[in-house]
Structure formats: C-alpha cells, structure tokens
Amino acid sequence: MRKKEKQKYFMEKLHQIYNDKNLNLTKSCRREILNQYKNLSNNKTNINYASYKLYPHLRDALYDNKDSELLGDFMKIILKYRWKAYFAMILPTRF
C-alpha cells in the first residue's frame, strides 16, 4: 500500500472506532481521536506520530473493551506504526 492508501485506511478505522456506540471510550480518548483525525485530514501530522499520540488512550480503551475486535485489530496497526515515531525522536539526538 502506498502512503495515501495507508493514511486513508487508518482514518477509516479511526472513524469507525469514534462512531461505534458499543465501545466505552472516555472523553479524553474521543477528543484525542478527533484531534488526530483532523490533523491527518489537514496533513499536519503523519500516521506514525498519530499512532504515538493515540496509543495510551486506545490502550486504556482496550482494557475497558476487551471483547472489541475492531479495537483489538486497530491496536495492532497502532503498534506497527508507533515504533517509527520513536525512532524519529531518538535518531536525531546525539549519543
């Protein structure tokens, strides 16, 4: 998949999670999902950094919604992209 296709898929999953009435999401989690969705749609951020920002909120939501297949699958995607944000933060620093 190309970059735009990945971003579109990521944003579709965010949209599904945000609008799923069966999920018990906190206000801060919903707010962060909305912020990252807006930033991605305006090209102010990338998938890696959005994954980094969403991870703590969605991890807690997954604990509250253990039976959610949608959230579990999306967490796998988040974990896949999150490590790239860590490398982007660490590599520019001097050792």
Features from the language model and the residues they span:
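Short acidic/histidine-centered micro-motifs embedded in hydrophobic/aromatic stretches
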Residues: 32-36, 74-77
